[in-house]
Amino acid sequence: MALLSIVSLQVPKSCGLKSLISSSNVQKALCISTAVPTLRMRRRQKALVINMKLTTVSHRDDNGGGVLQRRIADHHPNLWEDDFIQSLSSPYGGSSYSERAETVVEEVKEMFNSIPNNRELFGSQNDLLTRLWMVDSIERLGIDRHFQNEIRVALDYVYSYWKEKEGIGCGRDSTFPDLNSTALALRTLRLHGYNVSSDVLEYFKDEKGHFACPAILTEGQITRSVLNLYRASLVAFPGEKVMEEAEIFSASYLKKVLQKIPVSNLSGEIEYVLEYGWHTNLPRLEARNYIEVYEQSGYESLNEMPYMNMKKLLQLAKLEFNIFHSLQLRELQSISRWWKESGSSQLTFTRHRHVEYYTMASCISMLPKHSAFRMEFVKVCHLVTVLDDIYDTFGTMNELQLFTDAIKRWDLSTTRWLPEYMKGVYMDLYQCINEMVEEAEKTQGRDMLNYIQNAWEALFDTFMQEAKWISSSYLPTFEEYLKNAKVSSGSRIATLQPILTLDVPLPDYILQEIDYPSRFNELASSILRLRGDTRCYKADRARGEEASAISCYMKDHPGSIEEDALNHINAMISDAIRELNWELLRPDSKSPISSKKHAFDITRAFHHVYKYRDGYTVSNNETKNLVMKTVLEPLAL
């Protein structure tokens, strides 16, 4: 299949344009609905079915009193036994592989540097698109950490030719703007903090307001342009109507294209982007998919840029993927030992998802030096899960009050009043926080204990509030529920504690933009809670947890049905996503994108797990496949 040529094929708007969609279809795509339809391009396996009803069991009071009736949810057990994890090994940690990777890195840098130096191959008609293609490919392959300087130089060059009302052409001397180049530039420049307006997309509409391309373009070139238009539309800011129109139109167009074109690297890219978009996309999963899609299509058909060595990029990407895989196994073995030796494995009433949490962490950050971030993320998520199950089901009201008070006193002597199962959890939490504080002092240069303690106390207060609601069968208003639920989701603590261990300076003015009570934190927490509720409210209700965004909305709106509540909440999530884009990428921010990106990516990881169902509670087929493809299975070199 012919892909986009590096030679500019633009024509004026007044000459030879063909609409990309019929007039009737435009009305359907742009006017009837303002929400992108659910996109499920791949056939998935039958989901793992779990009975989520409560079981009531009898426990003897630790103090020698009567028998306590406890509620236990029927969570499935850990799927990844410690013996299995400890048996895993990888040859890719050897020096020979890292040395090969270092050699290829230098060769790819030479490719980058050849773009401005080789005027014969990369002339004034293709130099902008070539740079954008190179940056985009390197980032999607997960190897961009080696080329930060080259990426910045390339994007500075592209931005110098950006026109606010027209965008760019394929090259600096192109006569007319090009949709493919402009859409790719809009997305890439925006994600790197450049101030670019989506208004440029208005240029690529015909007289009727429909998106259009020059009639001279091939179907493959048009499809590539629409694909990059769709990708650009996903980084929309609030109020950008043209981006909403672009998203609806391009999603519809690409779905129809998939029904016609043969299997190829282009069809594979389209399937992946429609499946995961931007806000449920995980960098490591994308890297593996991008590698496999391009290899399966054959090297002879994969190269949009015939003068760039895609084979060399894939060679480096595969080496990097497998070298990190070796580190992943070592870190995962350490986490599994921690889970077993801490006694967590003996807590039969709770969910055990430490392997899944590690998968999320390593899909967020693939930098070898961020080991502390990954380990901290897993431990925090595991502990929040255990505590959530204690407060929602297993613990009695008296025990929960004792535990909450003990946390606020932050004194090990208070554990003597706790039941045995709570003592171990308290000690694990105490140790986890102190280890993080010690690590954070190295990276942040100050004592963060009080800051972290306050965050945990706020979490426990909301846990306690929800326990009271369950105990009294109280159903709050939607506003009352969401105010509490944004904190009880655990999003703040699951983000704050890991990012403080990064080698990214987070002075107070940056934390004020990321952490509570910032708008960034509120949006991230809302997305997690609302998306989670849409996926697990029925299972929660079966466990006796009546309060959810769905049930509270229906209480506030008598006569409404679940579908009404879900539509309202999904609209809230869509709005929050665009606003979170703004908080991450806003050009007027005092905080660099790099200081906010890990917090943003944690939100993406949780959103990914909740994409189709509650993969956080139930390790369904999508979750298990994610573990296999991004952690356990290396690529064939």
UniProtKB/Swiss-Prot annotation:
Residues annotated as binding Mg(2+) 3: 540
Binding site residues for Mg(2+) 1: 388, 392
GO MF term set: (4S)-limonene synthase activity; magnesium ion binding
The protein's required cofactors: Mg(2+); Mn(2+); K(+)
Class in the EC hierarchy, top level: lyase
Transit peptide: 1-56
Motif position, DDXXD motif: 388-392
Binding site for Mg(2+) 2: 388, 392
Cofactor binding description: Binds 3 Mg(2+) or Mn(2+) ions per subunit.
Bilayer-crossing regions: none
Catalytic function, reaction form: (2E)-geranyl diphosphate = (4S)-limonene + diphosphate
UniProt note: domains: The Asp-Asp-Xaa-Xaa-Asp/Glu (DDXXD/E) motif is important for the catalytic activity, presumably through binding to Mg(2+).
Extra facts: The conserved 70-Arg-Arg-71 motif may play a role in the isomerization step of the terpenoid cyclization reaction sequence.
The protein's name: Limonene synthase, chloroplastic
Organism whose genome encodes this protein: Abies grandis (Grand fir)
Biological classification of the source: Eukaryota, Viridiplantae, Streptophyta, Embryophyta, Tracheophyta
